[in-house]
């Protein structure tokens, strides 16, 4: 338990934590094969200009393969340690990088800092937060591929977000001090959704794919003691 506590401290301090061997070799190979199968079936949502192909429907199409990744036992201590019962899956997205790939500098939760300001206007509102868990399906290493963060990027609001100026935002990210990770097949990186980050292939012919679980903290969790049943999520926020 002390190791988990230390890693939670690291997650808060650094904005990320690398969990080695989160998936067994068998789990990793199964997920990799099914992501490749999804590509063969044409289930991708698209292929963007930087070389990222993404899939948003795999949890619904193949729950027997992808549902075990949600709150996986190797990752649960970190998700639960940060968010407890208020941890909610927002989405599961798989990626394949079929050719050259240099991801744009980006944040998954761009709205974090503005929401942090807005919440101060209200008596009961809680700060929205998000945490990602990315499972890597191949070995990344120097000369092959990597994951890069802006160092301490979860603690500092980047400029050029309001209004958003992507070229200036990306230039700012590129000019900062970075941390570079080389996750191996089966590793999982858990990180704050608002930290600026960038994935890349250093070798164009490298096979590279991953699965990301986006989590968010939702105070009214399923099973909380209340007299009524929740209607769900979509269309239930009248002031949003």
Name each region found by the language model.
Residues 1-13, 20-124, 234-237:
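Non-heme Fe(II)-dependent double-stranded beta-helix
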Residues 6, 41, 46-47, 163-164, ...:
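Non-heme Fe(II)/2-oxoglutarate
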Residues 92-94, 133-135, 211-215:
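A structural signal for short, well-ordered beta-strand segments
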Residues 94-99, 110, 136-142, 153-156:
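Short acidic/polar capping segments at secondary-structure boundaries
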Residues 101-108, 114-117, 143-150, 158-162, ...:
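A short secondary-structure junction signal
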Residues 107-118, 163-177, 226-231:
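Short, surface-exposed loop/helix-turn segments at secondary-structure junctions
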Residues 112-141, 150:
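A contiguous catalytic/ligand-binding core that recognizes phosphate-bearing ligands
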Residues 127-130, 140-198, 220:
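Double-stranded beta-helix
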